């Protein structure tokens, strides 16, 4: 390779390596100025311009729900979800801004959740590696005790 070509390629690679910080600043500014347009839920449905057939979901702002549409495979926008649950979680108000429970309900639900989690998986109660075996042993003993308490003791007669 000639020194001139090598110098040109070296200069080009140097220019490309220095460009990303400038472009990322421009990208951040664009994101700040256009944040409403980056929300896929605010975009209209875009079926695309190819000839494939894909069933997808989009968020309909008027109906306030996710609806099915035919996507042709290319040139769509971000308001295009493969699964309805993805569309719901991203766009539906229930998932975007979940209602906060009142004080009493919240205390009860947290207590019930904690009790349920502790009852179903004893191994989660101890996270220290050295004590994990002890926790598993306690679980085994507890399960054995429950099994034995369910059985009716058989009367044994020794003669």
UniProtKB/Swiss-Prot annotation:
GO MF, any single term: serine-type endopeptidase inhibitor activity
Entry GO CC: extracellular region
Signal peptide feature range: 1-24
Xref: PROSITE patterns: BPTI_KUNITZ_1, BPTI_KUNITZ_2
Top-level taxonomic group: Eukaryota
Keywords of this entry: Disulfide bond, Protease inhibitor, Secreted, Serine protease inhibitor, Signal
Localisation: Secreted
Induction cue: By androgens. Expression diminishes after 1-3 days and disappears 7 days postgonadectomy.
Disulfide-linked positions: 41-91, 50-74, 66-87
UniProt key word Signal: yes
InterPro entries: Kunitz_BPTI (IPR002223), Kunitz_BPTI_sf (IPR036880), Prtase_inh_Kunz-CS (IPR020901), SPINT4 (IPR042943)
Ranges for domain BPTI/Kunitz inhibitor: 41-91
Tissue: Highly expressed in the epididymis, in the epithelial cells of the distal caput and early corpus.
Keyword flag Disulfide bond: yes
Protein name as it appears in the record: Kunitz-type protease inhibitor 4
Organism: Mus musculus (Mouse)
């Amino acid at each position: 390779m000639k020194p001139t070509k090598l110098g040109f390629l070296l200069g080009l690679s140097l220019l490309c390596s220095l460009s990303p910080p400038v472009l990322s600043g421009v990208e951040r500014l664009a994101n700040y100025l256009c944040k409403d347009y980056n929300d896929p839920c605010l975009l209209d449905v875009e079926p695309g311009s190819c000839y494939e057939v894909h069933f997808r979901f989009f968020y309909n702002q008027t109906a306030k729900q996710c609806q099915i549409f035919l996507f042709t495979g290319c040139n769509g926008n971000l308001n295009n979800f493969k699964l309805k649950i993805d569309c719901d979680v991203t766009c539906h108000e229930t998932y975007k801004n979940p209602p906060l429970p009142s004080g009493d309900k919240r205390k009860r639900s947290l207590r019930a959740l904690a009790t349920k989690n502790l009852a179903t998986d004893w191994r989660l109660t101890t996270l220290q590696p050295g004590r994990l075996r002890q926790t598993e042993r306690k679980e085994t003993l507890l399960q054995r005790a429950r099994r034995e308490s369910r059985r009716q003791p058989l009367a044994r007669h020794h003669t």
